[in-house]
Amino acid sequence: MISESQGGLMSAFTTPPKFSGFIRRLVEEGYVNAQNMQQALEKAKKFKQDIVPYLIDNFSISPLTIAEIISLEFGEPLLDLGVFDPALFLKDKIDEKLIQKYRIMPLVHRGHVLYVATSNPTNIEAMDAIRFNSKLKVEPIIVEHDKLERLLSEHFVEETHFNFDTEELDLDVEVDPHTTDDDDEDDKLKDEAPIVKYINKLLIDAIRMSASDLHFEPYEKSYRVRYRVDGVLRLIATPPLQLATRLASRLKVMSQMDISEKRVPQDGRIKLKMSKSKTIDFRVNSLPTLFGEKIVLRILDPASAMLGIDALGYEPEQKALFMEALNKPQGMLLITGPTGSGKTVSLYTGLNILNTEHANISTAEDPVEINLEGVNQVNVNPKVGLTFAAALRSFLRQDPDIIMVGEIRDLETAEIAIKAAQTGHLVMSTLHTNNAAETLTRLRNMGVASFNIATSVNLVIAQRLARRLCSQCKRPIQVPERSLLEMGFTPEDLAQPEFQIFEPVGCHDCREGYKGRVGIYEVMKITPEISKIIMEDGNALEIAATAETLGFNNLRRSGLKKVMQGVTSLQEINRVTSE
């Protein structure tokens, strides 16, 4: 029998938490469940972080979604920062330290009222601090968090990493950028605060620009730094050539490489703490080139693996096929595409969906890119005999439910993976092929028996990443009907009343007309018809033709659908898919 006091105690633990304001709306509309929201509020408070960026960083909620919900809750319009002249921002009305601490921007001063842009008008501490500092009444104006952050990064210099100039360095020192002598550079770096600041600035700038890679490149008479943003390399900086060795050495120290070894490539890793609750990893590789060491960093943001399937760009029917394959107790799910096409994010998204307390998940990766809590991840190391095949054999003795292999590269790995898929395990992996049909014939060319391919593979996904048109500046264009038909549009497409194509323009928000990327997918289920072709040793063309008759869109068709939806441009689809 439970006493009254015990009952009260139990109800205290079982009563769902009560939320208010935009937090309540986010929970009610299903963006975050009540338990996760309560934990988010507690962690944000513990880390002294605003709840809005915390939710954006740790859940699949876009800045626009949160801004719209806050706008709805307050009954105030959502402001587009692009309508303001940046030269007129009232940066002198508030102490710069407060602007950086609370991430706000003073916009308009009228009488005794100061209007400030903020992504969270419920931050009472921030409003009070600004009111006290400015001696004015403060009225919040709701804006999107990412746009506000971009604006702040452009207009303010953060003390920790943005007040560096190459003029601070002693460039008169005789430094041979092509030297290979073993210097005591580790000791020198301790005193090179400007170099440290410069590297930190470049790393953080890359994250804020949503870059995927950073390239530090020495040449005979110049040095350059480039970022890959939305799949395209952009020139960012041209530091003096005299800094080449010092920049490379600093990056190698940060990634725990041997700075005295300049003759062979090296791999390393950097962890950059952005806040108390967010850390970004960089995978680093050095390459000895003719004029010094080229360093390339790949940004590994854990948040990219937590986006959720809806953020990847699947069409509804493609998403349904993906989820169906994930929910099967056994079989193989293969993802294919070139390097940089988003295969890893797709795999991790699937693993996150499957990652429950009831599943034993093991992965073999080269290397592990993002740490997933609750998943047993293994870095393959062929030098010591830990190959993909060796890891797979070990997994089968570990009572697995789900196995992920980073890439199927050889017959041994393929055969073990297929054996696992046929004996009660769900296996996920990738290959480098051009489309879904070629993936099946590639396995056969490796030496896998056609019967085993037909009976073990459940689904093949081919994918590309296309740049997403900026919603602020894209504009409609007229293209001759004949040209559209030649590009792959159908007469039925052109007959739709809402048919419209857009092109990039470029604005303050995006600069080049594109902002972000979207996935283009070919999702092919292995049906009885396709299985029959595989077992009869049919070629990729036959498989692709049958898939088309069954209603599976190829990459080109999926891309054209994104064009008709106004998500991307014809130029982008022509770039990432074939006719």
Swiss-Prot record:
InterPro entries linked to this entry: ATPase_typ4_pilus-assembl_PilB (IPR013374), P-loop_NTPase (IPR027417), T2SS/T4SS_dom (IPR001482), T2SS_E_N_sf (IPR037257), T2SS_GspE_N (IPR007831)
> Which Gene3D superfamilies does this one have?
3.30.450.90, P-loop containing nucleotide triphosphate hydrolases, Type II secretion system, protein E, N-terminal domain
Q: SUPFAM superfamilies given for it?
A: EspE N-terminal domain-like, P-loop containing nucleoside triphosphate hydrolases
Q: Where does ATP bind?
A: G340, S341, G342, K343, T344, V345
Keyword annotations of the record: ATP-binding, Cytoplasm, Fimbrium biogenesis, Metal-binding, Nucleotide-binding, Zinc
Q: Which residues are noted in the entry as Zn(2+)-binding?
A: C470, C473, C507, C510
Q: What happens when the gene is disrupted?
A: Disruption of the gene reduces transformation rates by two orders of magnitude. Natural transformation is undetectable in the pilB-tfpB double mutant. The pilB-tfpB-pilT triple mutant produces no detectable T4P fibers.
List, in alphabetical order, the GO biological process terms annotated in this UniProt record: pilus assembly
Miscellaneous information on this protein: Both PilB and TfpB are essential for optimal T4P production, with each motor playing a distinct role in T4P extension. Overexpression of pilB does not restore the transformation defect of a tfpB mutant.
Biological role stated in the UniProt entry: ATPase component of the type IV pilus (T4P). Acts as a molecular motor to provide the energy that is required for biogenesis of the pilus and the extrusion of substrates generated in the cytoplasm. PilB is required for optimal T4P extension and, consequently, efficient natural transformation. May promote processive T4P extension.
Name of the featured protein: Type IV pilus assembly ATPase PilB
Q: Which organism is it from?
A: Acinetobacter baylyi (strain ATCC 33305 / BD413 / ADP1)
